[in-house]
UniProtKB/Swiss-Prot annotation:
Primary gene name: phnC1
Sequence positions that bind ATP: G36, P37, S38, G39, A40, G41, K42, T43
Similarity comment text for this entry: Belongs to the ABC transporter superfamily. Phosphonates importer (TC 3.A.1.9.1) family.
UniProt-recorded name of the protein: Phosphonates import ATP-binding protein PhnC 1
Pfam families registered for this protein in UniProt: ABC_tran (PF00005)
Keyword line: ATP-binding, Cell inner membrane, Cell membrane, Membrane, Nucleotide-binding, Phosphonate transport, Translocase, Transport
Amino acid sequence: MTLRLSAIELRHSDGTLALRGLDLSIARGERVAIIGPSGAGKTTLLNLLASALPPSAGQLQVLGTDPWQLSSKRRQRLRSRIALIHQAPPLPARQRVVTAVSAGRLGQWGLGKSLLNLLHPLDISGAREVLARLDLADKLFERCQQLSGGQLQRVGIARALYQQPELLLADEPVSAMDPRLADHTLALLGQHAIEHNVTLVASLHAVELALAHFPRIIGVRDGRIHFDLAASEVGREHLDTLYANEQLSPQPVSDAAETRWTPRC
């Protein structure tokens, strides 16, 4: 089992209870989408799974171990097996794309190799290969400040794929992309997860993309799991209650398909 949560709660430093009573298991190789209204706790949940935030209560198992029972050094080793794709990747503006991508393996390299890579990228061909999968091979030596928001998101994804993690977490990874590119990018992430038996967990606002690309859908509202269903079982009634008091708009679909709904965010 890649992930196991039992009675998890997480309270922020200001006292806000962001996650409450979460019970969840995700097996190796599963592809899971987390959906829900803004402020539901999706990003907090992903940071918890990445061992970036400790739970306030409950039991957490990530890749077979409790991250917060480990020493700092061993927890850092665990994190090298986990990639977290941020909605706005924290990439230095003047950093070149090749360096940003190869930084995905800094947690697996020693200090000397990491410093050398900052001066001269050690695996240009490897970085180019993963960028090519995202149609960014021509941006290899450009600086991050020269890229659009969608291109920066794809660089963040390339960095995560280059890391070769066992657990791939993605927080709104395609929010800055046009619909066609978002669809293509999620298909690529899903195919990578299948080919490499990687566990993929992504938060998405676009419900139709979640239903199209992920076999399992978890709806989160007010820090709680509202439903946990196969994508084929998610109906309008589930989405209506998940997004209660949110403004929803129907997406155009074929006559044979079930109407899917997407929150405006």
